């Protein structure tokens, strides 16, 4: 025991005279230096390392807090003064390096690792640094630990849960994809005999479930309670997901090749359009509309179950080409014979139609700007180099494992990264990116021009009918005559007018996007907020502990009672999500979590703590180890609201309305209309390059 002017008592710090940890929490480097230098000058023989490595009431040292609070300069100073990066706290046996991984500052993780931090150490639950980073959705830290730290991607905790189990349980889809593509075992079983798919099913995380099924996870695997993932979904009232898992391997098109799949949808689209044409042509308007609505409902019920999600589908492109072909055949069959003398106009019209076909088919099969995935190993080296030299960290594609260039986006439908991603267009069954965006705009212009020509000649054709009543003599008589005489022509014109109204809006967005240098994806995606941490790990002052203990204990009781989830068996205990703190044997309260809102700086209510499950060896019952007061549980909560998935394919409502930009920040790519247009036309190669790394300011 060291007792130097009451600075240290045992292994804890006397808060009346010692201010190092509080100074570190507040990021006051000068106070830290001044305090330690004062002690050095007053007591040259005193071991400063022992002071620095002394902990608070929970055993957290100054380096713990500096790593978690992301005070990079303080971390460097403490390590230079002899701070131990592998000293475990008394509460959870977690090291400063593990707190650095939780904090998420990759440069701090790098620095602590290079100064002796051990990424393989485990806390009292068996969580190593990789599992901690996974729980907090720190994909860059996970990538660094795998590429540089040498951590095994399948390293388990004491309950045999791997990082993939935790990513599936937490709903971190992008991180899950990254781990699988880095070689994680999708069928690894924990002590309950559960795979990652079981835990994704337990929480009802739809995107991880679909991703794991696509990767080939065993959907019928039984756990120690004889429950499959679909059984667990059913017990948690996730009935849709239970049906999805149960029928995944029995999908009618999942085992056939893409050729038969595409042929089916092409034939179906042609027959469906002919059927709708037959309805409107042979029935009067009201019965036709009723039959049309009923047919659409049947199609929806039929199409959705047999459509492969996130897979290219030629249904809409075939529909578009068929519609245009009908218009072209009508023009050649009726318009050209009716107006044989305007040869130049017919020539221009045929050129427009043929150009449209050329552009459409080229868009169907063209490369929108795929970012090559053949540089994965080099990208990994570039990533490590950026971290080691403290440059800007490149963003990784969790599927392609490449450093994504700026404005690039991975399309889940096309399964590739697209440079300067604009959107995935279901009507061309392809992405719109840097290579084909101009061609896409030309296609819209050609369709608009063909529509104007078609409508003009349609009305001219009706006007030369000698039996037609004059419009001035009666509007109703005029419309009745032409609807009965030219029923197909009028219905098709109305149909094309609806399409043209939407395409005009789309063309407007595309042109203004070029002028303002903004893509449709950037217009439609939600604004990115500041990155939030799910908990602060900050113990409150000792004076506040007694006041807050009763409140947090009451919150814990109510939360536990309202958040119990059961898998529906006697061997599966309830999973209790506990809030706040518990009391230890001495009657003193444990370190409470001081939650902060990163957006406005105001304190918020603590988040629900996730469960760490252990098995009772004597009876095999699943138990929440946080329920027992004497175990001094960690007050850790994880980020449960994953914001990983940005849509790559717009829904029908967004396609029609195309909302205005929701991000109020200035567009960083807008250089003025003239420069934007020049860049769009000529400077396309820049979007294939990874962001030019710059020095990071700390």
Curated annotation (Swiss-Prot):
Major localization class: membrane
Chain residue ranges for the region called Disordered: 532-605, 619-653
Reaction it catalyzes: L-cysteinyl-[protein] + hexadecanoyl-CoA = S-hexadecanoyl-L-cysteinyl-[protein] + CoA
ANK repeats: 58-87, 92-121, 125-155, 159-188, 192-221
Keywords: Acyltransferase, ANK repeat, Glycoprotein, Lipoprotein, Membrane, Palmitate, Repeat, Transferase, Transmembrane, Transmembrane helix
InterPro entries: Ankyrin_rpt, Ankyrin_rpt-contain_sf, Palmitoyltrfase_DHHC
Subcellular location: Membrane
Every DHHC domain range: 395-445
Residue spans of biased composition, Low complexity class: 543-584, 631-640
Membrane-traversing stretches: 263-283, 286-306, 312-332, 334-354, 439-459, 489-509
Pfam families found in the cross-reference section: Ank, Ank_2, DHHC
Sugar-modified residues: 517, 549-550, 554-555, 564-565, 584, 635
Class of this enzyme: transferase
Any single Gene Ontology cellular-component annotation: membrane
EC number assigned by the record: 2.3.1.225
GO molecular function: protein-cysteine S-palmitoyltransferase activity
Membrane topology of this protein: Multi-pass membrane protein
Sequence similarity: Belongs to the DHHC palmitoyltransferase family.
Comment text on domains: The DHHC domain is required for palmitoyltransferase activity.
PANTHER family assigned: ANK_REP_REGION DOMAIN-CONTAINING PROTEIN-RELATED, PALMITOYLTRANSFERASE HIP14
Protein name in the entry: Putative ZDHHC-type palmitoyltransferase 6
Species this chain originates from: Dictyostelium discoideum (Social amoeba)
């Amino acid at each position: 025991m060291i007792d130097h002017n009451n600075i240290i008592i045992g292994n804890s710090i006397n808060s009346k005279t010692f201010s190092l940890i509080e100074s570190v929490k507040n990021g006051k480097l000068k106070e830290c230096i001044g305090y330690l230098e004062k002690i050095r000058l007053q007591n040259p023989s005193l071991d400063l390392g022992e002071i620095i490595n002394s902990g608070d009431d929970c055993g957290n040292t100054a380096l713990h807090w500096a790593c978690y609070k992301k005070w990079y300069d303080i971390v460097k100073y403490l390590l230079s003064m002899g701070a131990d990066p592998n000293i475990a706290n008394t509460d959870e046996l977690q090291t400063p390096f593990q707190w650095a991984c939780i904090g998420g500052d990759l440069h701090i993780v790098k620095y602590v690792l290079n100064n002796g931090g051990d990424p393989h150490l485990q806390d009292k639950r068996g969580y190593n640094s990789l599992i901690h980073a996974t729980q907090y959705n720190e994909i860059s830290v996970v990538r660094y630990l795998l590429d540089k730290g040498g951590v095994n991607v399948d390293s388990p905790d004491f309950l045999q849960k791997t990082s993939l189990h935790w990513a599936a349980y937490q709903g971190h889809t992008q991180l899950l994809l990254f781990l699988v593509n880095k070689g994680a075992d999708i069928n690894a079983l924990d002590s309950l005999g559960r795979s990652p798919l079981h835990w994704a099913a337990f929480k009802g995380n739809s995107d991880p479930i679909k991703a794991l099924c696509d990767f080939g996870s065993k959907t019928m695997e039984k756990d120690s309670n004889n429950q499959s993932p679909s059984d667990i979904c059913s017990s948690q009232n996730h009935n849709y997901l239970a049906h999805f898992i149960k029928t995944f391997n029995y999908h009618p098109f999942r085992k056939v090749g893409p050729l038969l799949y595409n042929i089916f949808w092409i034939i179906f689209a042609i027959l469906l359009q002919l059927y709708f044409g037959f309805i409107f042509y042979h029935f009067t308007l009201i019965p036709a509309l009723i039959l049309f609505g009923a047919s659409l409902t049947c199609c929806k019920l039929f199409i959705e179950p047999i459509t492969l999600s996130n897979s290219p589908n030629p249904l809409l492109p075939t529909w578009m080409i068929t519609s245009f072909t009908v218009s072209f055949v009508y023009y050649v069959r009726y318009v050209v014979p009716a107006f044989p003398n305007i040869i130049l106009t017919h020539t221009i019209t045929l050129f427009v139609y043929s150009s449209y076909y050329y552009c459409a088919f080229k868009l169907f099969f063209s490369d929108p700007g795929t970012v090559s995935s053949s540089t994965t190993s080099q990208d990994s080296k570039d990533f490590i180099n950026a971290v080691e030299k403290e440059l800007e960290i490149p963003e990784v594609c969790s599927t392609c494992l490449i450093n994504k260039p700026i404005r690039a986006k991975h399309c889940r439908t096309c399964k590739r990264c697209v440079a300067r991603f604009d959107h995935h267009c279901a009507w061309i069954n392809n992405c719109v990116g840097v290579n084909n965006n101009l061609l896409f705009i030309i296609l819209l212009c050609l369709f608009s021009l063909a529509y104007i020509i078609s409508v003009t000649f349609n009305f001219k054709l009706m006007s030369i009918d000698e039996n037609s009543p004059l419009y001035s003599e009666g509007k109703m008589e005029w419309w009745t005559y032409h609807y009965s005489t030219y029923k197909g022509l009028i219905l098709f014109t109305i149909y094309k007018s609806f399409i043209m109204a939407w395409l005009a809006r789309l063309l407007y967005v595309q042109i203004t996007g070029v002028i303002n240098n903004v893509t449709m994806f950037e217009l439609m995606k939600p604004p990115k907020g500041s990155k939030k941490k799910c908990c602060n790990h900050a113990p409150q002052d000792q004076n506040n502990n007694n006041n807050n203990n009763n409140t947090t204990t009451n919150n814990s009781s109510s939360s536990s009672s309202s958040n119990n989830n059961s898998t529906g068996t006697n061997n599966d205990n309830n999973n209790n999500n506990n809030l706040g703190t518990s009391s230890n044997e001495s009657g003193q309260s444990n370190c409470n979590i001081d939650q902060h809102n990163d957006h406005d700086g105001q304190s918020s209510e603590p988040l629900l703590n996730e469960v760490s499950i252990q098995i009772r060896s004597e009876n095999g019952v699943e138990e929440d180890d946080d329920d027992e007061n004497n175990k001094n549980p960690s007050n850790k909560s994880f980020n449960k609201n994953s914001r990983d998935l940005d849509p790559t394919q717009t829904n029908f409502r967004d396609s029609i309305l195309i909302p205005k930009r929701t991000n109020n920040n200035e567009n960083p790519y807008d250089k003025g209309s003239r420069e934007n247009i020049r860049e769009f036309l000529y400077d396309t190669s820049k979007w294939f390059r990874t962001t030019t790394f710059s020095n990071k300011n700390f």
